């Protein structure tokens, strides 16, 4: 495959161009945009149950009561640009209604949230082309760990942010703390994507490749937030067409765009390792020729 890629790129093609061709080939073969659409659909169905489960976990720990409020504002300000306030109001109403549900309904919420985890697992292993399967109990443990530890780690990071803000009275630390707080969303995105690419696939993922793919995804995610917010602000066509319902297509487009970025980071991670292996195989083949 690599030999064909090099031939198409030209005899003296640089490795970066050959890798980009391989990346594009994999994106096309994996139908990445279709996978992103499927995940966006499942995410919208699972959004309220997932948030309900997350904040129910915070409610179980009184020490995180203040952090829970900060986490809500942080999520909607940094992960849902432009329309975060409107979406936050609607979702908080839905979550408040879900608190009135019975035990059977609560179990249904948890199952729906876990279905999103399963969809993510399936999509990433499709990209990694891994046919290995985990035991059901182990898969459930991984999904539950993501549901529980993810929000708690986010709560701890916000507690650290609050502590850093409390130190801003010291003029010497002002600039340093501002810089740390400015890059915190990027850092959290990078760590989250790295954990996703490292833990979810059922095959071994080189740590360096996962870090590179996660960093590219984090950069695109941060740039996407700013670009999407700018588009919504400068070209408010959705508001003109849909009126008060504009939040629905805006949310769907943003969720779809987010999953495109997540899956692109996964494709980059996979392609780095695959290109390295194919290059070694091609070099070995040339060395074996008389």
Swiss-Prot record:
The chain crosses the membrane at residues 44-64, 104-124, 140-160, 180-200, 210-230, 244-264. InterPro entries: UPF0761_bac, Virul_fac_BrkB. Keywords: Cell inner membrane, Cell membrane, Membrane, Transmembrane, Transmembrane helix. GO terms for cellular component: plasma membrane. Coiled coil: none annotated. It is a multi-pass membrane protein. It holds the Pfam family Virul_fac_BrkB. Residues 65-103, 161-179, 231-243 are periplasmic. Its main location: membrane. Residues 1-43, 125-139, 201-209, 265-290 are cytoplasmic. It is found in: Cell inner membrane. The keyword Cell inner membrane applies. PANTHER family: INNER MEMBRANE PROTEIN YHJD, UPF0761 MEMBRANE PROTEIN YIHY. Belongs to the UPF0761 family. This is UPF0761 membrane protein YihY. It comes from Salmonella typhimurium (strain LT2 / SGSC1412 / ATCC 700720).
């Amino acid at each position: 495959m690599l030999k064909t890629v090099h031939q198409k790129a030209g005899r003296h093609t640089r490795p970066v161009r050959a890798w980009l061709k391989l990346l594009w080939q994999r994106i096309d073969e994996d139908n990445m945009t279709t996978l992103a659409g499927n995940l966006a659909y499942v995410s919208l169905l699972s959004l309220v149950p997932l948030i309900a489960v997350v904040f129910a976990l915070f409610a179980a720990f009184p020490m995180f009561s203040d952090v829970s409020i900060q986490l809500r504002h942080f999520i909607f300000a940094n992960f849902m640009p432009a329309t975060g306030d409107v979406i936050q109001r609607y979702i908080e109403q839905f979550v408040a209604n879900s608190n009135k549900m019975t035990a059977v309904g609560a179990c249904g919420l948890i199952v729906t949230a876990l279905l999103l985890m399963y969809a993510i697992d399936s999509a990433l292993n499709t990209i990694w082309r891994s046919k290995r399967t985990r035991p059901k109990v182990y898969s459930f443990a991984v999904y539950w760990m993501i549901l529980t530890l993810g929000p708690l780690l986010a709560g701890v990071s916000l507690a650290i942010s609050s502590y850093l803000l409390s130190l801003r009275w010291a003029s010497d630390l002002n600039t340093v703390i501002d810089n740390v707080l400015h890059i915190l969303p990027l850092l959290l995105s990078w760590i989250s994507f790295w954990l996703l690419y490292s833990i979810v696939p059922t095959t071994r993922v080189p740590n360096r490749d996962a870090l590179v793919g996660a960093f590219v995804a984090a950069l695109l995610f941060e740039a996407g937030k700013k670009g999407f917010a700018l588009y919504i602000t400068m070209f408010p066509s959705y508001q003109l067409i849909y009126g008060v319902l504009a939040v629905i297509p805006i949310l769907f487009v943003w969720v779809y765009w987010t999953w495109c970025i997540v899956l692109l980071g996964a494709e980059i991670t996979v392609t780095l390792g695959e290109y390295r292996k194919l290059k070694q195989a091609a070099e070995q083949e040339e060395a074996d020729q008389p």
